[in-house]
Amino acid sequence: MALLKKRKHERSEQDQEYFQCYSDVSIHEEMIADTVRTNGYKQAILHNHCALQGLTVLDVGAGTGILSVFCVQAGATRVYAVEASAVSQLASHVVTLNGMDNKVKVLNSPVESAEIPEQVDAIVSEWMGYALMYESMLPSVIYARDKWLKPGGIILPSAADLFIAPINDRVVESRLDFWNEVKGLYGVDMSCMRPFAHSCIMNKEMAVNLLSPEDVLSFPVRFASLDLNVCTQEEVRNLHGSFQFSCFGSSLLHGFALWFTVTFPGEKTVTLSTSPYGEETHWKQTLLYLDEEIQVEQDTDITGDITLSPSDVNPRHLRALLNYSIGGGLRRTKHFHMGT
C-alpha cells in the first residue's frame, strides 16, 4: 500500500511538471504558429460539419481553446474544453472574445478527474508529441473515449501511423568538421575535440531536427498503426514493429528518423504529416543516432525492429529500443530516451 501511494505521489508530481510546461506562452505560440498543424485541424473539423452540426464535443487538452472554437464554427452546439494547466483561464477569454460563452464550457482539470455531465458525440484532441508518443497524452484520450464517447461517435484524429527510415545527417558532419576548421579560423588546432563532440552528438538521447528528403537513404517503412476508435491503453504502451530497407546509394548512415501522420475521418479525408517530404511542422523529425556512422552503398540491406514505450522513471517521457543489422552483419542493439 505504501509503495502504491508513493507511485501515485510521483505520478502526480510528474503530471504537475507536465501541466506547468503548458502554462507558458512559448509552447502555445509554437503550436498555433505551426500552420500545417493548425490549418490541418481546422480543415478536418470544418470538413466534418455535417457530423458535428448540433452535437456535443469534448476537447481533450484544449490549451488555448482554438480547436473548441473551430468545433463551434463547424456547428457544434456544446463543447467541453478540458485543460489541466493554468492556460485554461486564457482559453475562457478566447471563448468570450469569439462570442461562444454559451456553447463552450472550459473545465480546468485533468480529463481523468473532469466532471462532464453527459455523453458526447465527438472527441477532438491534439495529443501528439515528438515521435508521436512523447508526453504520453494519448492515454487521456483513450480514457475520455471509453468514458464519454457515444457508440458511433467520432474521434478527431481517428488514426495514427509511425514511420522509420535510415538517414544521413549533414548537420552532424558539419558540426564534427567544425573542430577541424578551428585552426584555419583562429590559428589554434582543436581537432582533438572531434571525438568528444562525436560522443556528445551521437549518444542515447533522441534528437529533434528537421531533415530534407535528400537526407533519407531508403523508402520509409510504417512500423506501427493506431486506430483511435478501438486501441487500448495496453496497446499504446508498447508500439513495436520491424523494418527492412534497401539503400538508394553510397552514403554515410548516421542513424534513423521517426515521424508520424494522423488521419481525420469525414467525407474528405484530411491527413496531417510530419514527414521530411512534406511541409515543416514544429514536430520536425525524431532522430536516433548510431554510436558510429557506417558506410552504405546502393542496395545495402538494413533490417531490424523498434519498440517505443514510456520511461520507467516518468511515463510521460519516452524510450526506444532499436535492434538493427546492416548488410547482413552483426545484429546490434541500442537504447534511446527522450526525457528521463
From Swiss-Prot:
<comment type="function">
    <text>Arginine methyltransferase that can catalyze the formation of both omega-N monomethylarginine (MMA) and asymmetrical dimethylarginine (aDMA), with a strong preference for the formation of aDMA. Preferentially methylates arginyl residues present in a glycine and arginine-rich domain and displays preference for monomethylated substrates. Specifically mediates the asymmetric dimethylation of histone H3 'Arg-2' to form H3R2me2a. H3R2me2a represents a specific tag for epigenetic transcriptional repression and is mutually exclusive with methylation on histone H3 'Lys-4' (H3K4me2 and H3K4me3).</text>
</comment>
<dbReference type="Pfam" id="PF22528">
    <property type="entry name" value="PRMT_C"/>
</dbReference>
<keyword id="KW-0805">Transcription regulation</keyword>
<dbReference type="GO" id="GO:0035241">
    <property type="term" value="F:protein-arginine omega-N monomethyltransferase activity"/>
</dbReference>
<feature type="binding site">
    <location>
        <position position="37"/>
    </location>
    <ligand>
        <name>S-adenosyl-L-methionine</name>
    </ligand>
</feature>
<dbReference type="GO" id="GO:0045892">
    <property type="term" value="P:negative regulation of DNA-templated transcription"/>
</dbReference>
<dbReference type="GO" id="GO:0044020">
    <property type="term" value="F:histone H4R3 methyltransferase activity"/>
</dbReference>
<keyword id="KW-0678">Repressor</keyword>
<dbReference type="GO" id="GO:0032259">
    <property type="term" value="P:methylation"/>
</dbReference>
<dbReference type="Pfam" id="PF06325">
    <property type="entry name" value="PrmA"/>
</dbReference>
<comment type="similarity">
    <text>Belongs to the class I-like SAM-binding methyltransferase superfamily. Protein arginine N-methyltransferase family. PRMT6 subfamily.</text>
</comment>
<keyword id="KW-0234">DNA repair</keyword>
<keyword id="KW-0804">Transcription</keyword>
<feature type="active site">
    <location>
        <position position="126"/>
    </location>
</feature>
<dbReference type="GO" id="GO:0006338">
    <property type="term" value="P:chromatin remodeling"/>
</dbReference>
<dbReference type="GO" id="GO:0006281">
    <property type="term" value="P:DNA repair"/>
</dbReference>
<dbReference type="GO" id="GO:0016274">
    <property type="term" value="F:protein-arginine N-methyltransferase activity"/>
</dbReference>
<feature type="active site">
    <location>
        <position position="135"/>
    </location>
</feature>
<keyword id="KW-0489">Methyltransferase</keyword>
<dbReference type="GO" id="GO:2000059">
    <property type="term" value="P:negative regulation of ubiquitin-dependent protein catabolic process"/>
</dbReference>
<feature type="binding site">
    <location>
        <position position="83"/>
    </location>
    <ligand>
        <name>S-adenosyl-L-methionine</name>
    </ligand>
</feature>
<dbReference type="GO" id="GO:0006355">
    <property type="term" value="P:regulation of DNA-templated transcription"/>
</dbReference>
<protein>
    <recommendedName>
        <fullName>Protein arginine N-methyltransferase 6</fullName>
        <ecNumber>2.1.1.319</ecNumber>
    </recommendedName>
</protein>
<keyword id="KW-0949">S-adenosyl-L-methionine</keyword>
<dbReference type="GO" id="GO:0005634">
    <property type="term" value="C:nucleus"/>
</dbReference>
<dbReference type="GO" id="GO:0042054">
    <property type="term" value="F:histone methyltransferase activity"/>
</dbReference>
<dbReference type="InterPro" id="IPR055135">
    <property type="entry name" value="PRMT_dom"/>
</dbReference>
<dbReference type="GO" id="GO:0042393">
    <property type="term" value="F:histone binding"/>
</dbReference>
<dbReference type="InterPro" id="IPR025799">
    <property type="entry name" value="Arg_MeTrfase"/>
</dbReference>
<keyword id="KW-0808">Transferase</keyword>
<dbReference type="InterPro" id="IPR029063">
    <property type="entry name" value="SAM-dependent_MTases_sf"/>
</dbReference>
<dbReference type="GO" id="GO:0035242">
    <property type="term" value="F:protein-arginine omega-N asymmetric methyltransferase activity"/>
</dbReference>
<dbReference type="GO" id="GO:0070611">
    <property type="term" value="F:histone H3R2 methyltransferase activity"/>
</dbReference>
<feature type="binding site">
    <location>
        <position position="28"/>
    </location>
    <ligand>
        <name>S-adenosyl-L-methionine</name>
    </ligand>
</feature>
<feature type="binding site">
    <location>
        <position position="61"/>
    </location>
    <ligand>
        <name>S-adenosyl-L-methionine</name>
    </ligand>
</feature>
<dbReference type="GO" id="GO:0070612">
    <property type="term" value="F:histone H2AR3 methyltransferase activity"/>
</dbReference>
<keyword id="KW-0488">Methylation</keyword>
<keyword id="KW-0539">Nucleus</keyword>
<keyword id="KW-0227">DNA damage</keyword>
<feature type="binding site">
    <location>
        <position position="112"/>
    </location>
    <ligand>
        <name>S-adenosyl-L-methionine</name>
    </ligand>
</feature>
<keyword id="KW-0156">Chromatin regulator</keyword>
<feature type="domain" description="SAM-dependent MTase PRMT-type">
    <location>
        <begin position="15"/>
        <end position="339"/>
    </location>
</feature>
